Amino acid sequence: MTVSTAFQNGDVDVAQIFITDLQKLWLEQDLPISTYVDEAPYQLCMTMPTLFFNTEVEGLDQVAVRKAIAMAVDYDQVISSAMSGQSPTFADVPRSVMNPTDGEQAMVDQDALKEYQWSNADVEGAKKLLDDAGIVDTDGDGIREYNGKNLSYKAECPTGWSDWNATLEIVAAAGKNIGINIETYFPEAANYNTDYSTGNFEITMQSGPGTSVANPYMRCRFFMSSDYNDLEVNFSGNFGHYQNDRVDEILAAIPHETDDAKLKDYYTELSKIMLEDCPCVPLMYRPQVFHEVNESVWTNYPQKDDGTNVPPMDCTDGYGVAALYNLELIDG
């Protein structure tokens, strides 16, 4: 029996798993299941599963190639299909180094970033970007070349991670639409961990820090800090070995800055650099942990705006433990 089946049967009270089309459990099957938020995205999204390009791989060392792939991706399909609606869209919360929570969004100037954003699945814009860079298909095989070699890459994440697997298939389709061959590769988790942590990949997917007292700063390091580039084994971030001196200057300055306006300027500039250079590309917003409850035995679990301020941390982590004191037996 899978965890999902046990949860739906009522053998598990609280689940921390991704369930495709979660809302169908109560809308169609009429099960006593609820989430922290009643409406889509149903969860409190605080992390950003992200595409990383290996900038030491020929072709992917070119901004035009990385950005073209980023522009061509159908993010709405990622969110509606791969995530089955369990994420805000980038129209709702435009991409930046920030997660979609109100506290972090207040720390970035989204108006200043508007000119650097791209529309969803902008295939024609991506093609033009590549054409203008002289990266074209010269032999008619449907694949563009750079330095005489086809742009052909492998994108990987662990097998069995259904939402991530589906997301990379959408990325691969985006590549095909603009003349870049991207093949998906779904190894066992142990092999995937070895690949991304040692730089043995071309395109990979990883999820960064969520919400904590160390963020958004540590997430910015995760996205773009060159401090990790010389590590033989790196589980910390910037897996594609991106190098940008201005990024490093800002990251060195932030811990010493106390002025909120200046910090906002720094985080806005980091967002601008990420959007312009595309060393990595956030693909969706996602819960730090999933929080689904089956109320066949216990009820009164925490929900958004219920006045308790207990976070959706599965009743086990940090102040989330406080949820246990509010539970009531259904037949009590």
Locate predicted features.
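Short, solvent-exposed loop/turn and secondary-structure capping segments
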Residues: 6, 25-28, 80-85, 90-94, ...
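Ligand/substrate-recognition segments at binding pockets and active sites
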Residues: 1-9, 117-119, 135-211
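Short, solvent-exposed loop/beta-turn-alpha elements that line the ligand-binding surface or hinge
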Residues: 27-46, 52-62, 97-125, 138-150, ...
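Extracellular/periplasmic solute-recognition and catalytic clefts
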Residues: 1-57, 68, 76, 80-82
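Bilobed periplasmic-binding protein-like "clamshell/Venus-flytrap" ligand-binding domains
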Residues: 80, 133-158, 207, 255-294
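Solvent-exposed, polar/charged alpha-helical surfaces in well-ordered, non-transmembrane soluble domains
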Residues: 2-5, 9, 51, 63, ...
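Paired acidic/hydrophobic, glycine-rich loop segments that form the ligand-binding mouth/hinge
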Residues: 13-18, 202-207, 282
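Periplasmic-binding protein-like
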Residues: 26, 56-104, 115-131, 271-282
